[in-house]
Amino acid sequence: MKNWFEIQNNAESETADVYIYSEVGGHDVNAKTFIDELKTIKDKNIDVHINSLGGSVFDGLAIYNALKNHSKKVTTKVEGIAASIASVIAMAGDKIEMAENSLFMIHNPFAS
């Protein structure tokens, strides 16, 4: 992958695959780049494959909102770990799937 994400349109099906397999927002690629590429998807469905320890909260929130508000059907698939902001992105799916051996980590909430 050239970035922390990869988008593959699939000519044989109606589902595009999006892979978030690294630190969210790393390598000088921000949410705007991700969202700009997300807009190019022509398929009816989007599968977001996640294996990430997290990353930039602000980029992650923008990605969550873009996926949650997308007109396509979004399925998020935790394939290894969705930790920190990656767990928030995972919650953007219309359908959320996890393998039995996958991990989903959220931070301890705090309130005043």
Give residue spans per PLM region.
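N-terminal organellar transit peptides
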Residues: 1-87, 91-112
